[in-house]
Amino acid sequence: MAAKKIYDTLSKELAEEVQKCGCMKQTGVSLRHMMNFGCTSSPRNLLISAQFLHKELPIRIARRAIELENLPYGLSSKPAVLKVRDWYLDSFRDLRSYPEIKDKNDELGFTKMVKMIKVRHNNVVPVMALGIQQLKKERPRFDYEDLREIHQFLDRFYMSRIGIRMLIGQHVALHDPNPPPNYLGYIHTKMSPLEVARTASEDARGICLREYGSAPDVNIYGDPDFTFPYVPTHLHMMVFELVKNSVRAVQERFMDSDKVAPPIRIIVADGLEDVTIKVSDEGGGIPRSGLPKIFTYLYSTARNPLDEHFTTADVATACTMAGYGYGIPISRLYARYFGGDLQIISMEGYGTDAYLHLSRLGDSEEPLT
């Protein structure tokens, strides 16, 4: 079935290549390896990096394209999902038609192309969310348990996307002739988790202020001088999502109350193995029965902004307080990508504690499936 559909979209030769590449073994990379490799962005290293991506990206992209064709409950035929599949097939075609990379000019041309591929895939998450939303509207009786298969696919799909974007972004960033201090590509070798948490919290409060007119305070505790190597954009995204959920929960709970809204507390702890960031709120918590659902892509405690009047063209521009229920599961994937994790503990009637664990060691390879 999958091959037939891919044959309809691509030439016979290219469709066979998709199938062939989709069966090949992926090669995982660790944060430490990326750092060691990025220490010297010499022309030789950039050439090796481009040659690796030229071989690796088609394998990863082909796997996802094939999987997008074989989703249960008719999800593969939803217009939004077909659009995403076509982006993946276009990117596969671009990569496979690029000639062997032998010199600096080849490498620069390749870098320009993968940069365009990254932009092409910018809106994959909201467009896939629209496809899921279309399915939920058709099958309103589906419980999240029934959709376990789709949830597992989305975990694999989004984890793969994080990896693809990290590899491309890292390669492109190594070309920067004037990188910011202490940066090796995307990686900040002396990142202050406190500083990133502060910026992310202010961004989350800003959205709350726009939506509600006021926002609870966020207090941050920890050693301001502590730094470790990590990807600041990843950490910002994770803390932003956690704080956004917390400020919304507290704001809605205390909106009509005479009491002052209690602050969100962020604690940064630096252990030997992990850096742990705890985000605590008094927003009323989540019922115990709802806790397993918060890590699924089909559940949100807030109104879902992906209504039927949205199209794949404008869905990505929707910026609301609640998002589309993907922030928590995707944050956990970002944490796990470099060997960390995200746990959430809730006290119904009081509040929620989120524990974001980040590996300090940097030697865990990408979790590829």
Task: Enumerate the predicted regions with their spans.
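Conserved glycine-/histidine-rich ATP-lid loop and adjacent helix of the Bergerat-fold HATPase_c
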Residues: 322-326, 330-339
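Signal-transmission coiled-coils
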Residues: 3-217, 228, 232-236
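Short conserved segment of the HATPase_c
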Residues: 286-314
